[in-house]
Every structure is written in C-alpha cells, then in structure tokens.
C-alpha cells in the first residue's frame, strides 16, 4: 500500500532537519558549532570590556551620563578644595523645561564607582525629572580625591552647589529637590541636618542610615566589621595604597554578596545570549569598572562613624566647629525608597533611623517632619536607581508629585502605587500610568519589618568598641612600619594588582595573547550559525546553569549562616561585652539621641501660638482646614485631591507654593492640637454671603469626589463640614446668623 505525501506538510525545525541529515548526532553537531562560535564571541566581548575599561580610565572626567552637561562649579577651586563638581544637565531636543518648576539636583554615590548612574539612560532619575518639566543638575566627582579632603569638606562644597542652584532659579516655586543615591543619600541627609534651609524635598534611594539594623538569617553584610576585627583593616588598606583607598575593594565587596551572579550568571547571560546581550553588558560594565579612589581620612570616617559606629542616627557626629548632625533638624519632606530585594541596604537599614530618633508619630510631627517611604518587593540595590521600570514607576511618580509631597502635613506615610485604568476615579487628574497614594502609617509599621533587639544592639556596640581598640593598636605598632615600607611605586604596583583590575587588564588588547580574538570573532560573525532554541542540548545547558547557580547560592547561604552564628556567639559573650565596657544586662536603648530641651521649649511655645491663631483667618484658611479634616478620616492623600486643591491657590488668592505649604501645615497642626476648637471656629471664618459659602463647600465636595468613592467616615465628616458651612442636607443654605458662633477676628 502506497502512502501519499501531503503537499501541505508542516515545515521542519532546524533540529529536525539536522536529525534527518546526521541522524542522532545532528543536534549535537549543531550545538557544538554554536557553542564554539559563542565561546569565541564571548571572549571578544571580554576583550572589548577590557579595552573599554582602559579607555574610560584615560578620560579626563570619566562618567556614564548619557546627557550633555555643562560645568557650573568646579569643587577644586573652592577654599577647601574637593574633587566634586556641579554640572547642569542640558535638556535633550524635544524636552521643554518650565522655569517656574523647582530644580532637581542628583547626587551620585561615590562608593567605588564613577559618577553618572543617575543619568545612565533616558529612563533614569534625570529622564523622569526632565519629563516632568524640571531643570536638572548633577553632582559628580573625579577619580582622584584632592589631598586632605574630608567628608565635611564635601558637604560644605555641596552646600555651595545648592546655593548656586537656588540663585540660578529665583522664580522657582520651591527649593531644589535633592536626590541622593546610596552613599549620596546619607551624605545629603548629613548636609540637610546642618543646612536645612537649602533643601526642598529629599529623595534617598537605597541609602543606609541605620547601619546595625537587620533581621537574623538575612543582611549578613552588617556583620563584616565585627568579623574582621573592626576598621584596622581599612586603615591598612589605605596605607598600602599610599594614603588612598582603592574603590575597587568596595566594588569587590558588593560582588561578594552574590557569588552566583558574580562568578556565573552575569557571564552566562552574555554567553547564552551572545548575539543580543553584548551592548547592554558593555554599557553597564563601563560603569561597574569605572573605579575611583577615596582618601584614607574619608573611608576611615565612613567605616568608623557610620558602618561600625552607627553614629549618624544617634546624633553623635559633629562638624569641625562643633555642630551636631541631628537628622531631626531636617525641615524638608524626606522620601525613603528601599527594597526587600536589596541585600546592600535592606529596608531595616533604610528606615531604622526613624525608630532610633522618634518615640511615635506625634514625635515626628512635633519636629515638623514629613517622612514618606516606599518598599519595592524585588528590585536589587542597583536597580533602585538604574532600572528603567523603576524609573518610570517610582521615580516618575516622585517627580510628577513632588509638590504634593512637599505640602503633605507632617507625619509618617507610605507611598503605595496602583496602576491607573480607565475605571480609576478622577483618572484625568492623574499624571502618568500610576496612582501614587500616600497612606498614613505609625512606627509599628516600621517595627513590623523586623530589627534588632537589645541583645543585638549590645553585640554591635561591643564590636564597635573592639574596633576602636584594634585600630588604636594598629596605629601604634603596625602603621609606622607599613608606611615606611610602602613607597609611592609600591603603592601604585599594589593598586594595579587589585583582583578586579587584573581581570579587566588581562582580557584586553594590552595582553598580546588576546590579539587573535578580534579576527577570530569577525570570522565567526560572518559565518554565524546559531543553534535552534528547541535543540535538546540547549535545554541541558540551561539545566546545568541552574544547578551551578543553586550550588553557589547554597554556598553563599552556608557561609552567611556561619558568619552570623560566629558574630552572634563571639560578640554575645558577656565576658567580651563587659571587657568592652558594655553592661551585658543592660536593656536600655544604646543609641537614642538626647532630647534638645531648648527645642522642646520652642515646640511648646509654637503650640501655644497656634492655639491662639485657631479663630483667625478667612475663607481660604477655612476651606483648607475643612479639606484637611475631611481627608484625615480617609488616612491617605493622593494626586487627584491635590490637583483639585491646587486650584484653590488661584480661586482664593494665588499663593506661592511655599506659603501654601505653610498654610496647610498650620491648619493641620491646629486640628491636631484642638480639633473641637478648630472646627467650632470655622463659621466665624466664613463670609456672610450664602453663595460664597455654597461655592466653597462645592469645592470641598469636589476634592472628596476626585479621590474615589467616599467611605462612611468620609460622608460623616463631610456632613459635619456642611453643617459648619451653613449647608443643609438638601444643599439649602442655613441663615448665616444661625451658624455663626465664634466672634470674628482679624485675619
């Protein structure tokens, strides 16, 4: 019986064709050819990476900004010279800047890498600021520090930079919004505590401020200082560098936190996607390999005062002229952006300072502070300020709603993001694809993230004391010998021998053995034969890769568990704690900064002043007070209500944003101090004209409606406000004399 072949047979895949031609060996041959070609192309990418590294370091001002920039201030020309500079980012073609919008100033981290990551691509912190119409400035740095420069010198230079930005934008509707990434975040917070008048809203992304914080079973990086015996090793490394600390060691420390990615995944992604992955990989490696140096004084301050000493939140850092760095002095709203997927700055380290400084939310309010935080579920440390998706969502919403954040009443909020849809109430009032809602929180919400108990605090305090002892011993007995042996040529040689730098150098054209790779890669590209995706050997390759990652992750988990157990056991020893001057039985907080008695007296004086102002004001003050009261029942603020409220600035007298912010805060505090008196005073603040009161109440209802379906509590509060405004249940106006209870006073 003959079998007739159909003219409409399904097309054969490459793997099936190979099987037909070579039998069972076909897929194996295809895979072998592809693997050989990928190997050549992979090593050529590594060669390009090495050449790129050498070219980048040869630049006068190496950076990875994807925008054109013009120098405004060179920090090397200041009275206390530093290697920092202020540049203006030139808006790209097609970007329109509103001269009345507050400028954004982005401070990049100097933590081993060069500057520019905040403007690495279009979808970045710079990009979203431009999209929202803001002028944008950037604070960067050179690879080599100025002789003798200190962290305080850098802070003073950044103050000069901000003064210049403010002077360049006299018509802006607010002080600059300053973004600090990673190390740049804590540096910005220190400056804001000393010079609060220079700042608008502050956004700190992936920035540690509470360096001991964390939870057991995670966050092992915080144990490093204790396990190494303290900061003496930092001093030794600086001495071996001839008075400079090679930032490549910081980069290597980051890489050690994720051995699977460092040793395998990063390279495997290039190898397995060799035809498409190279440009993205090389673009990032340009930043990752752009190492910079720090002075010995700078890195020693960072390690001693911050990472081991944990003195920032405790208020124990002082400037050279004796001014204490107290984060409670910051008057601007603080936005904290962190992630559960960040193993460098976990949420506990980004937010723990709030628990260190304040007893409760009322304590935050008494300092006049507004703190907004948001926690991403998965993104890693670099993704917080590199990821395009994060830039479009979180950073984009921060930029679009920066005025809303600036006018939030004091307190603690969490920024929650919801996708905007056609069914979103008031969608036309929402800019972008997301609705950012600021929900009121308490300190219990921060505590729920987990953290240290009293025993953990004693362990870290003991490690800090031991670090001081070991550093003193090193400086007394070993440092003079090391410095005598390490001449400038020796220091330079040791710097070139740093393991990460060797990787870049050896896989570049500087190595004659790499010379044939470029020609071989060119031939491969001409005759490229990628394997089919359904080849069984590709599936085997993926399986092996996953097993390697799992093995490396298992090794990491094992070593981290051993490190944690060692730290907890050694520094939990009552004998060692007693020897270090730490009482093993003490359960009191070790790092609570003292209350400023003068400040407390000023707070009480301000409360009395606000109480006396409760009956004062006119229609504008009454409407704002009523809006705040109705919104307090909802427990959240979002851009829809704010966009509606913004119109009040023109309807009831155009107020500058700074004055509008003051008005909102004063009315909010009055409601907190004495809600009953504040509400009872509303009728006396309203005009006698029924139509004016009716229109004002319509505005309040419009704001409530813009924020979505009102709750029962919202309806109750709105009804109460309606009664006070003289509006009956059916919208009828109550005769003014029937609602006027408090004698009018001058505005």
Where does each model-flagged region fall?
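Conserved acidic catalytic loop of the alpha/beta-hydrolase fold
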Residues: 144-149, 156-175
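Alpha/beta-hydrolase-fold enzymes
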Residues: 2-45, 167, 171, 188-297, ...
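Short beta-strand/loop motif that positions the catalytic acidic residue
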Residues: 330, 336-338, 342
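Conserved alpha/beta-hydrolase "acid-adjacent" motif
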Residues: 344-349
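Small-residue-enriched hydrophobic alpha-helices in membranes
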Residues: 583-747
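A catalytic-pocket lid/entrance helix-loop region that shapes and gates access to the active site
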Residues: 195-259, 363-365, 369-378, 382-402, ...
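Gly/Ala-rich beta-loop-alpha elbow adjacent to hydrolase catalytic centers
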Residues: 179-184, 188
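Short, surface-exposed "cap/lid" segments of acyl-processing enzymes
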Residues: 59-145
